[in-house]
UniProtKB/Swiss-Prot annotation:
GO terms for biological process: fatty acid metabolic process. Pfam families: p450. This is Fatty-acid peroxygenase. It catalyses: a 1,2-saturated fatty acid + H2O2 = a 2-hydroxy fatty acid + H2O; a 2,3-saturated fatty acid + H2O2 = a 3-hydroxy fatty acid + H2O; dodecanoate + H2O2 = 2-hydroxydodecanoate + H2O; 2-hydroxydodecanoate + H2O2 = 2,3-dihydroxydodecanoate + H2O. It comes from Bacillus methanolicus (strain MGA3 / ATCC 53907). The gene is cypC.
Length: 419
């Protein structure tokens, strides 16, 4: 007698176009319609399994059952991740490389990052006071680019900042794009990888000497399990894997501004300077608004879970956005409520805006701590250190666009620094 259950299956030859059309809601919509946290479909011409929820996240991050190597579509590798980056590694190789990333996330280094972020916000607000209007998303990307480079020990000239900001942004803005936007994203990555490769060569030749605790120094001199230096191409990819995600925090900064505008009562609460409430607000922004839609892996070997058969090599998608809006996990998930984090216990599988699992042993985003600290500084500036007006504009955002940002990119005007 068989114990294998029939997995709910989406009809159709291929559903890639539906995923592109529905974006963040694709998996969640079908979880609702099938009344199931797991279903089968076809994506990019191949069988795929989509799943969401806390239990699904727990099994997805089981490294005995899933692997990351060769899971991401090539067009995403060519724009977002780069080749041979930490996201595509498994086993001891992944663990060793991940330790390189975690080595720059010490409390002291995060404090340095916080100080740098504050200084860059100060400079930006001074500039904004002289501007008729500020397109916050574009300006936030530049703040984040300057912050990332200074913290990572990457020397960048003033006349290079605009180019680098634009190109780092293009890498994550084009990850789900087709046509010209995709090719612009690929060109942006190729250009900056070559630029960083040349910089790493100069570090190794002794011509550039970044501080020892910085990304550029550590990644330039990192040795793999065999004791070899990373080839310059891979080292450059990993340096960009620090810079690019910090620039992407501009998306969250945009949503912070949107939340402050839509929920003015929250802004009043934040003016008290309560650090705990600031943390709760930041976490709710990360939960409530769209960032990563899903993550992908391949089934490592045949196994059965909840009566469903997973066959080796099957592409599997974990619903990040949907898990953060799962009513089984979150009460009133479509209501913006920072208070829900007052007694939150910090599960690594129920709250997964940037992925789940363990920081050191698993594939949870190493930069999550960076994101939270930078967001708290940004929230403080938008709440307590400057005044501004939000003129009429289109603040809606599309759940089909990946990544999603408000259509107007949040325009503010009449910026005044508080004394």
């Amino acid at each position: 007698m068989s114990n294998i259950n029939q997995m709910p299956r989406e009809e159709g030859i291929d559903s890639t176009w539906r995923l592109m059309e529905e974006g963040y809601m694709y998996i969640l919509n079908r979880r609702h319609s099938f009344n199931s946290d797991i279903f089968e479909t076809r994506l990019l011409g191949k069988k795929a399994i989509c799943m969401g929820g806390k239990e699904a996240a727990e099994i997805f991050y089981d490294t005995e059952k899933f692997k990351r190597k060769d899971a991401a579509p090539n067009r995403v590798v060519q724009t977002l991740f780069g080749k041979n980056g930490v996201q595509a590694l498994d086993g001891q190789t992944h663990k060793h490389r991940k330790e390189m990333f975690m080595s720059i996330m010490s409390p002291d280094e995060l404090e340095k990052l916080t100080d740098i972020t504050k200084k860059q916000w100060e400079i930006a607000v001074d500039k904004w006071e002289q501007m008729d209007k500020v397109i916050l998303y574009e300006e936030a990307k530049e703040i984040m680019c300057r912050t990332a480079c200074q913290w990572a020990g990457v020397p960048v000239q003033e006349n290079e900042v605009k180019r680098l900001t634009k190109n780092l942004g293009a890498m994550f803005e084009s990850a789900a794009a087709v046509g010209l936007k995709h090719w612009l994203g690929r060109h942006a990555r190729n250009y900056e990888e070559i630029w960083i490769e040349e910089l790493i060569d100069r570090v190794r030749d002794g011509k550039v000497n970044p501080p020892e605790n910085t990304t550029l120094h550590k990644f330039s001199w990192y040795r793999d399990l065999e004791g070899n230096l990373l080839d310059t191409e891979t080292a450059a990819v990993e340096v960009i894997n620090i810079l690019r995600p910090i620039v992407a925090i501009a998306i969250f900064i945009n949503f912070i501004a949107l939340a402050l505008h839509h929920y003015p009562e929250e802004k009043e609460k934040l003016k008290s300077g309560d650090k705990k409430y600031s943390q709760m607000f930041v976490q709710e922004v990360r939960r409530f608004y769209p960032f990563f839609p899903f993550v992908v892996a391949l089934v490592k070997k045949d196994f059965t879970w909840k009566g469903y058969k997973f066959e080796e090599g099957t592409l599997t998608l974990l619903d990040l956005y949907g898990t953060n809006h799962d009513p089984e996990i979150w009460k009133n998930p479509d209501v913006f409520s920072p208070d829900r984090f007052a007694k939150w216990e910090g599960s690594p599988f129920s709250f997964i805006p940037q992925g789940g699992g363990d920081y050191f042993m698993g594939h949870r985003c190493a930069g999550e701590w960076v994101t939270i600290e930078v967001m708290k500084v940004s929230l403080d500036y938008l709440t307590n250190r400057m005044d501004y007006e939000v003129p009429d504009q289109d603040l809606s955002f599309s759940m089909a666009s990946m990544p999603s940002i408000p259509h107007s990119k949040v325009v503010i005007k009449n910026v005044k620094k508080r004394i």
